[in-house]
Amino acid sequence: MDTRRGINTTRRKSSLSFDEEAFKDKAIKSFVVVIMKAYISVDLEGMPYVVIPGHLKLKGAQYEEVRKIATKLTLVVVNALHEAGFDEIIVADSHGPMVNLMVEELPDYVELIRGFPRPQAMVTGVEGSDVALFLGYHAKSGTAYATFDHTYSGGSIQALKINGIEVSEFLLNTYTAGEVNVPVILVAGDYQLLIDDVKVHTPWAERIELKRSFGRSAAKSPGLGKLEKDLQTGVERAVSKFKEKTTKPLVTKTPVNVELTFKNSYFADTSELLPQIKRVGGHDVKFTTKTMSEAYEIFQLLCLAAAGVAAIKHDQ
């Protein structure tokens, strides 16, 4: 109170409270740039028009045709992701020796993983990604009406089960990505894989049909122009689902129980050289691991050992 003028000078306490820390936090967040990272695994058997072995081998008569198609469709997905706000994009070349894509066609913002052998093979380096997309994927071994049906190693593996479920390469890789909290949001490939596995195990993932097979070496595919449009809109839908939080990682339980059926007893004999492998049949073995990534590594090692045995026996 200013007694000289009769004026009340007492400061009134504001009814509004000021949280300085909350204000600072909000101010900082308003300037934070969120970097989104996508991971693309590219196989070849599920690509359109691939119907003969000559499409799939480095010295195959039609190999260059498939390289161009796979690169072209990969670029469609890469560009669609970039337009949707993904600044970091990793492409994993994932067929055979894993040196198939035409590197000179890839934009500067893409990092390419290529070469084999490598950890977790088809999903090397997936950790730290926000989303994963699989292109050119095919059905598992023993699937009817599916071109080049096989599971990872067509020459040695008859069937692979993880925790009692027979898996395709799609499911093997999806479990591995899920272990590091990465959801698969789009799969493009053979119709039979999309129906048998993708729709069943990851119903939230966009499914883009690149081919519909009449058998192991015959299939029908739309024109490239239509496929490019399908992939473009598919990526847009998949990213929208991700941003709306309607996608999720697919995680298998641990410990991981693996059952493996080889195509002959030579391979099962060889696998028993590892102490953690238990023989349960003429062609059958099983093992248990603490993590999905560990299961993948042992499985991959057994496939490589089988390939070595096959080469040795071929020369005898």
Q: Where are the regions a protein language model picked out?
A:
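Active-site rim beta-loop-alpha module in soluble metabolic enzymes
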Residues: T176-V239
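Short catalytic helix/loop segments, enriched in acidic residues and glycine
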Residues: H55-N79
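Extreme N-terminal starter segment of soluble prokaryotic enzymes
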Residues: I35-Y39
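C-terminal accessory domains and tails appended to enzymatic cores
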Residues: S213, L227-Q316
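Active-site glycine-rich loop that binds ribose-phosphate moieties when present
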Residues: P117-R118, G154-V180, G189-L193
